[in-house]
Structure formats: structure tokens, C-alpha cells
Curated annotation (Swiss-Prot):
PANTHER family: ARCHAETIDYLSERINE DECARBOXYLASE PROENZYME-RELATED. Catalyzes the formation of phosphatidylethanolamine (PtdEtn) from phosphatidylserine (PtdSer). Its cofactor is pyruvate. This is Phosphatidylserine decarboxylase proenzyme. It is a peripheral membrane protein. The modification Pyruvic acid (Ser) is found at S182. Pathway: Phospholipid metabolism; phosphatidylethanolamine biosynthesis; phosphatidylethanolamine from CDP-diacylglycerol: step 2/2. Pfam families: PS_Dcarbxylase. It comes from the Bacteria. It catalyses: a 1,2-diacyl-sn-glycero-3-phospho-L-serine + H(+) = a 1,2-diacyl-sn-glycero-3-phosphoethanolamine + CO2. The active site is at S182. InterPro entries: PS_Dcarbxylase, PSD-A.
């Protein structure tokens, strides 16, 4: 599959460069015995910013998982960004997960809203309403509305979003990044059927999160 992004995310290049320079300088001055923790840190930073290509399911009504991580919520909830009752599915990313976000569906971006907030543990339910977050509301060609919300966490304090209202999105398309541990909430139309359960490990784009109903 042709993936139009480097396998090490561009968002991490400055951090990797800094970690490499520090490790090299300390190694040059004090040898490996002194520098090994910094080499270990470099390895950690490189693995954190990995961004591998993924197989993308082609099932027509499938909603794909927007992020790597673990399912922490599957529930009926109010979607405050599209003002409706919805099926809410939440994915928590720890520091060892890939942290790019990918579109769960094909569609057009209806709006993008950023909200400043706190930096609570993203695994907590209240993080959805209280933490810094960025919501992307997407309308599919069939008329379904899907909301994906990037949420900052205890360590993650930098949400990056690369789409604007009116732009098209393809399922599996990379549209954002959150640095160092975070959460993504997905709100789906009532009648959608969840294909995941709480505690399940999921992968961005390759895991089917839910199935949309036949009619919007």
C-alpha cells in the first residue's frame, strides 16, 4: 500500500534530532557508560513517533478506528459537537502507542472546533468534557454524521490537526497527531452497531470500530 507519510512521523523529527545530538555529545565526552540512558531515550523517542502504514478495510458501512490504543468506553452519550444523542466509543492511547489520528470514514469535514481545557489523565471519563480537545465533524456521502475528538492527556499537551471545514477526508487518511499519551472519542449516529468492547486493543484504520445504520 502506498502510504504518503514517512514511517517516522515528521512531528517527531525535531525531538529525535535533539535526543540524538545529546546522546552523541555525552557519548563523546563520557563514553557509552555515561551515555547509555540517553541512547535508550533516543530509542524511546523514535518508537513513539513511528507511523506505519495500515491495511484499510473496504466494507461500505464500516467506521474505522481513528487511533491505536485500548477501548475505554462504549456507551450512549450526547454528542455536544453535533448536538445529538449518539453512540460514543473512546480509545485511550498510552505512550507506547502510535499517536497519529486517521479518518474513520469517507466524507467531508463539516466543522473543526478547538477547546482549551485541563490535562487530566485521558483514561478518565471526565477527560472528554474537561481536557483540551479538538473536534472534527464529518458528514459521509450517505448523510451520516461522524464526530472524532482528539483529547489531550496528562502528558500529551499538543494537539495537531491538519484539516479544515469543507475539505474531503478518505477513510484511513491521516489528519492529526497528539504527542505523548492521549484519547480519541468517536460519536456515531444512533442505530450504529459497535464492533469493539471495553478493554479491547485496537489499531488505527485496520480495526473496524462500528457499523453505521443503513439510513442516516
Amino acid at each position: 500500500m502506498n502510504y504518503p507519510h514517512p514511517i517516522i512521523a515528521r512531528e517527531g523529527w525535531p525531538f529525535i534530532a535533539i535526543a540524538a545530538v545529546v546522546a552523541l555529545l555525552i557519548h563523546a565526552v563520557g563514553g557509552f557508560g555515561l551515555a547509555w540512558p540517553f541512547w535508550l531515550l533516543l530509542v524511546f523517542v523514535v518508537q513513539f513517533f513511528r507511523d506505519p502504514p495500515r491495511a484499510i478495510p473496504t466494507q461500505a458501512n464500516a467506521v474505522l478506528c481513528p487511533a491505536d490504543g485500548r477501548i475505554v468506553a462504549v456507551e450512549t452519550a450526547h454528542d455536544p459537537y453535533a448536538d445529538r444523542e449518539a453512540l460514543k466509543i473512546s480509545v485511550f492511547m498510552n505512550v507506547f502507542n502510535v499517536h497519529s489520528q486517521r479518518s474513520p470514514v469517507d466524507g467531508a469535514v463539516q466543522k473543526v472546533e478547538y477547546f482549551p481545557g485541563a490535562f487530566l489523565n485521558a483514561a478518565l471519563d471526565k477527560a472528554s468534557a474537561e481536557n483540551e480537545r479538538n473536534a472534527v465533524v464529518i458528514q459521509t456521502g450517505a448523510g451520516h454524521t461522524v464526530t472524532a475528538v482528539q483529547i489531550a492527556g496528562l502528558v500529551a499537551r499538543r494537539i495537531l490537526c491538519y484539516v479544515r471545514a469543507g475539505e474531503p477526508l478518505s477513510r484511513g487518511q491521516r489528519y492529526g497527531f497528539i504527542r505523548f499519551g492521549s484519547r480519541v472519542d468517536v460519536y456515531l449516529p444512533k442505530g450504529s452497531r459497535a464492533r469493539v468492547s471495553i478493554g479491547e486493543k485496537v489499531s488505527a484504520s485496520s480495526t473496524i470500530l462500528a457499523e453505521l445504520p443503513e439510513q442516516p
